[in-house]
Amino acid sequence: MSTHKAARDPEAATAVEAAGDPDAAPDRHRTDPRPTPLLVLDVVGLTPRLLDHMPHLKSLARAGSHAPLETVLPAVTCAAQSTFLTGTHPAEHGIVGNGWYFRDLGDVLLWRQHNGLVAGDKLWDAARRAHPGYTVANIFWWYAMGADTDITVTPRPIYYSDGRKEPDCYTRPPALHDELTAKFGTFPLFHFWGPGADLVSSRWIIDATRHIISTRHPDLTLCYLPHLDYDLQRFGPDDPRSLKAAADLDRALAPLLDDARAEGRTVVALSEYGITRVSRPVDINRALRRAGLLEVHTQDGMEYLDPMASRAFAVADHQIAHIYVRRPEDLEATRDALAGLPGIGQLLDDEGKKTHHLDHPRSGELVAVAEPDAWFTYYYWLDDARAPDFAQLVEIHRKPGYDPVELFMDPRDPYVKVKAATALARKKIGLRYRMAVVPLDPSPIRGSHGRLPASDDDGPLLICSTPRAVGDRVAATDVKALLLRLAGLG
């Protein structure tokens, strides 16, 4: 019998001790049960309105309990998930968005993966203090790499030396990679983000989660399901295609919910934010450039943001933008440049950031919050002919801000499908290729998030299979304590 199993199973631990000591007798009065196993589903974009189109999750809510979830500012994936897992605000854990300006590097970086960026006591640390040997599987929640979890599955493309990018994932333990790939195929990265993003990626994640639960039985399983993020941003939350996406995801989830029920798992389904209808893109960096505050450098006719030389620039992240101002004397000029820009609802200074628990050194000197029907582009060039070549690619790591237009193929290019087919043909024979199909026009976007919700119906939600587990509302900072309590460790 392994000592790892003994650490998880009190009766096994007693047997190990007795085997090592012939005079020892089993302690039949031990009351140290295994924690209640949990399945925590991050159903991106889930709101009370969408729940009406998701009968399996609605049934779970009806039989158990549910409440509006009070999210954090910014209401984006990395910040919200970090709050769920640490019980603290961005001001404490330091995840001020899906990316930020790394001042020491002079570079804007989004979608980093190292858990070391998240400060604070993690959920699994607290669980293991209460129950040594507590096991955790993180399946696609962010900042997974380097986390002290037992099982990890997270997206990780193969970047070949010739510039090619191919789908894949990272796992821990490493042998799990080939096990999942043999059973379910290569992780479908190009269905996870980009013009081809659809249910295929969430189905793969669901299949991987079911396999890990049935073969490893972790005490806590975290599962991230991105499907609602796609069509709700493309078409808006009330479009029939978005409502169909909700029904499709609910149907795909049913076998996983059945597995959890059969194993006696408590299920928690929650969301980080609700996606609301938008129609106004706000070119915040172009306003700063026209004011002479943002600088670019040019190579081969293409303009690149120069964050180290700029007096001020913005890192756009959905409906939030961190504005980095190099010198205090430029703060007033930066405010003036943005004061009349349509679409900005609030411009948070030091006091405003403190009010919203966003006062962290990684935050911008100012933080812009969009009006309800607006969102921020990252665009900084003034002429599309001078845009960098990566602007028309799915390049989440090279763009100095979030670009939801990557969900589309350029509708104005009559040859866009021919270009895509040619690039795909080059890829299949092992040649380098450029899938330059993303439009430079932001107007197709119909859904966004990042602001605090105006109403509960449009905000995130928490569902628990346990009756009376939650009260009238749940704060994002209380999710960690709630999960510990549901596990019997609170």
Regions found by a protein language model. Give the residues of each.
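Active-site-proximal N-terminal segment of extracellular/periplasmic enzymes that hydrolyze or transfer
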Residues: 2-7, 21-68
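His/Asp/Glu-rich, glycine-adjacent segments
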Residues: 3, 11, 17, 23-26, ...
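Beta-strand elements within well-structured catalytic alpha/beta cores of enzymes
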Residues: 33-49, 60, 84, 127, ...
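C-terminal substrate/ligand-recognition segments
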Residues: 421-438, 443-455, 460-490
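Short glycine/proline-enriched loop/turn "hinge" motifs that connect secondary-structure elements
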Residues: 32-33, 212-217, 449-456
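Secreted, luminal/periplasmic, and some membrane-associated catalytic domains
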Residues: 34, 43, 75-76, 100-116, ...
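Short, structured active-site-proximal loop/turn typified by the sulfatase FGly-forming signature C/S-X-P-X-R
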Residues: 49-92, 135-137
